[in-house]
Amino acid sequence: MSLGPNLTDPQVAVLARQAVDLLDPELAIDIRPTPCSDPYNRAGGSWLVWPRIDGHRSFGIYVQGSWTPVRALAQLIDGLAENSSESKGFWSRPFPPCASGHRHPAGVDADTDDVVLRCPDTGDVVERIRPAL
């Protein structure tokens, strides 16, 4: 049985920074390991990533250590997409941005190597993002 890549603290930090930089490179990030409540989880740790939006932790994004870097980055971008537009600093700003002229956010998907941002209307690929590991 393969347990997967087992992400490490430094790798999660790199992926979190990469995702948050897409929203705003000036945002600080807090990252904390989460206690393992599952005694059968042998796949490594997990973390909560908190972008400090509007000067505080407004939401956390869960990352599991057994995920691939692509899945973890997709989760981080999707978590930002779901929550950032509800904050004062990014109110109603579509994230991740879709194609030029579109007012809605791109959808977040993943393939083997990249996070894929797609227009929800056309299905066209807006951007491919490779994890910076």
Locate predicted features.
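General detector of N-terminal leader/presequence modules that precede the first folded domain
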Residues: 1-36
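Interaction interfaces in information-processing and related assembly proteins
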Residues: 22-75
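Cys/His-clustered metal-coordination modules, chiefly Zn-binding fingers
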Residues: 64-133
